[in-house]
Amino acid sequence: MNGGICPTCGLPKELCICEEVAKEQQRISVKINRRRYGKEVTVIEGLDPYDIDLEDLSKFLKAKLACGGTVKDSSIELQGNHRERVKDLLAQKGYNMENIS
């Protein structure tokens, strides 16, 4: 049990800025892929699975966008075309808007 200590930097969780630094440095791409029967899937790539909890981010996005989705490798797939709304939500979560394409 860590007792509130960040495993990356060793600081208490209240003082840890590891996740904020990781959010600022990542280059994220948001693309639309077509699947079978003409279904569209929004794919978010460029996220580092070691610095950011992809499951937690995926859960947040699925709840805000009211859609289904999954985490595959180091990308998040959301059902439907949500490109612009995903960019806004990522910026709201603290990601640098200039690094989202």
Swiss-Prot record:
Keyword hit for Protein biosynthesis: yes
Keywords, alphabetical: Protein biosynthesis, Translation regulation
Single GO MF annotation: mRNA binding
PROSITE patterns: SUI1 (PS50296)
GO BP: any one term: formation of translation preinitiation complex
A Pfam family of this chain: SUI1
Domain of life from the UniProt record: Archaea
Family: Belongs to the SUI1 family.
Protein name: Protein translation factor SUI1 homolog
